[in-house]
Amino acid sequence: MINLEQFISQYVTERDSSLFAKDIQNNSVALTKAIKDKSMLVIGGAGSIGSSFIKACLQFHPKALVVVDVNENGLAELTRDLRSTKGMYVPDDYVPYPINYAQPVFEKMFRARGGFDIVANFSAHKHVRSEKDIYSVYCSCVYS
């Protein structure tokens, strides 16, 4: 079976560690104080940026992690990834919700949980304008 992390390091990024590794290490005391035993809500957590944020934060042991995303398959992938990664800390209170944060059920969940210590919002449109229509970006950047 292929080791995905090793493959990415060797063939994609061509580096052994994250560009943020040194900063995270240098600020580990402050990050631990800010995250350890805190409740976290990550909106848009199934996407690439949100899931990377979650993985970076989990090493500092939050007491609760609630992930909200409209992409139910992405939430399932994130959950499998977190639970199958050797050495990955996942709090007992880990709940993925496939909901839109603009729906009334989001507010109901938020109030029922009594709020959160940390809220991070990485929700975004699936495709940005430049991916769909490169010429619109060209026109607005060159002719504006």
Please state what every model-predicted region is.
Residues 39-60:
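N-terminal Rossmann NAD(P)H-binding glycine-rich loop of SDR-like oxidoreductase domains
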Residues 1-39:
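Non-catalytic terminal and boundary segments that flank Rossmann-like NAD(P)-dependent oxidoreductase
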Residues 94:
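Short, conserved active-site loop motifs that form the nucleotide-linked donor/cofactor pocket
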Residues 78-79:
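Conserved SAM-binding loop
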Residues 69-74:
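Helix N-cap at the beta1-alpha1 junction of Rossmann-like dinucleotide-binding domains, i.e.
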Residues 56-67, 83, 89-90, 99-138:
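NAD(P)H-binding glycine-rich loop region in Rossmannoid oxidoreductase-like domains
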